[in-house]
Amino acid sequence: MQFHFIGGRWVEGNPPLITAYSHGAWMGTIVFDGARAFEGVTPDLDRHCARMVRSVEALGMRCPYAAGELVELALEGVRRFPKENALYIRPMAWSEDGFMAPDPDTTQFVLSVVDSPLPKPNGFSACLSSFRRPGPEVAPTEAKAACHYTNSGRAEREAKGKGFDNAVMLDPIGNVAEFATANLFLAKDGVVHTPVPNNTFLNGITRQRVIKLLRGAGYEVHERTVSFRDVLEADEVFSTGNYGKVLPTTRIEQRHLQPGPVYAKARELYWEFAHSGPTGS
């Protein structure tokens, strides 16, 4: 089941949106964000909506709704589903007109709420990708823009062709940036490490939340330059992201790993946080 808020009303199903000559489809000026509803909570929904507005502005468009209004719209959509359903909440914006640059006065918007079960935390495998994340000099890396995901899709497709679920992507100078679909964490001797944000990947909202929760629980967390060798030699590797929240990595290249105590604590802390309030804030 899915509902979409378009043109001031909710529509059920999967309606067509973009015209044949739309700037969004032609030049790729589409931005979106993703939040989750599950078990009756919507953790960090306010932060996802605020990032959506920033992403729209970063691509030279104009969001027709303020962040607080997006929160209310999202919750309105969530209430159309049974409380126990796991949902994906996705605001999206694009420009209809413009040539190279979008015309901000023609910014279009849709907010989608769809049934989307959370992935089971069974673990995933990953290999090193031959594709790299772009730098801010060549792409709008500060925005959650659809144009970035063709590169992530190439990395994921390459990994699946080799028999892996996901890929570790490096930044332009060869340091680890993230997984193709989520932020990357590793643990070594009980200490947590994660690549420092350097404008080549999104400093994820779930990533920031997990860092704060782990530090609050007494863990030492270092945001630093991470090499692929660090990942290969880690005791634990796990991912954070809106779609799957906190998930363990069970194989890096040919090295098998077990979900460890740091991962387990991170997931436990995140679920406790998510249930701490109606929006997890």
Residue map of PLM features:
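Helix-start/capping segments and mature chain N-termini
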Residues: 1-76, 94, 102-281
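An exposure/low-complexity boundary signal
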Residues: 81-83, 100, 255
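Ordered, amphipathic secondary-structure segments that act as subunit-interaction surfaces
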Residues: 74, 83-93
